[in-house]
């Protein structure tokens, strides 16, 4: 149940960030926190909001989420894992990105901890309009590949997910 709820939450956030894509023009090359703006505009499900916290939201699995515009080119959703939910969260994110691949330029997953093991995958997966023979395509990811990619991150690591709209 919680994983399905989490998937609905991320769908709402990611599609909401698409609606806010014009904000990136105002961001310049600065890291801008838009979590508060998305909360105030109704772009975040109410169960993800904790009173007294306006810079972060929480998903159904208890992961803390920061949403920002990191540059002119992409939104960044940083997920601080709450225990051993990271692999399941990663699988949800990649599965959702695969579904949204016609609208995405790229989904980039990476562990944020300096001591995080490197993955066998590039961890950059491209949407339908930007996918080439030499690039990893979101639409071509198999369930087994999604499992292998997410398992390569290990546990208890922060995961940075970059959603790039073009």
Please state what every model-predicted region is.
Residues 24-57:
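Extended amphipathic alpha-helical segments with heptad-repeat/coiled-coil character used for oligomerization
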Residues 3-28:
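N-terminal alpha-helical signal peptides/signal-anchor transmembrane segments
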Residues 45-166:
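Intrinsically disordered, low-complexity regions enriched in Pro/Ser/Thr/Gly and acidic residues
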């Amino acid at each position: 149940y919680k994983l399905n709820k989490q998937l609905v939450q991320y769908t709402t956030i990611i599609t909401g960030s698409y609606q806010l894509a014009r904000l990136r023009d105002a961001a310049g090359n600065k890291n801008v926190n838009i979590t508060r703006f998305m909360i105030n505009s109704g772009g975040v499900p109410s169960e993800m909001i904790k009173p007294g916290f306006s810079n972060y939201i929480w998903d159904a699995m208890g992961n803390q989420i920061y949403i920002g515009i990191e540059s002119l080119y992409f939104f960044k959703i940083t997920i601080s894992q709450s225990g051993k939910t990271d692999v399941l969260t990663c699988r949800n994110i990649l599965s959702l990105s695969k579904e949204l691949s016609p609208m995405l330029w790229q989904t980039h997953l990476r562990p944020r901890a300096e001591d995080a093991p490197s993955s066998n995958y590039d961890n950059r997966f491209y949407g339908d309009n930007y996918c080439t023979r030499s690039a990893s395509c979101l639409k071509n990811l198999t369930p087994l590949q999604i499992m292998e990619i997410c398992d390569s991150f290990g546990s208890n690591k922060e995961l940075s997910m970059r959603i790039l709209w073009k």
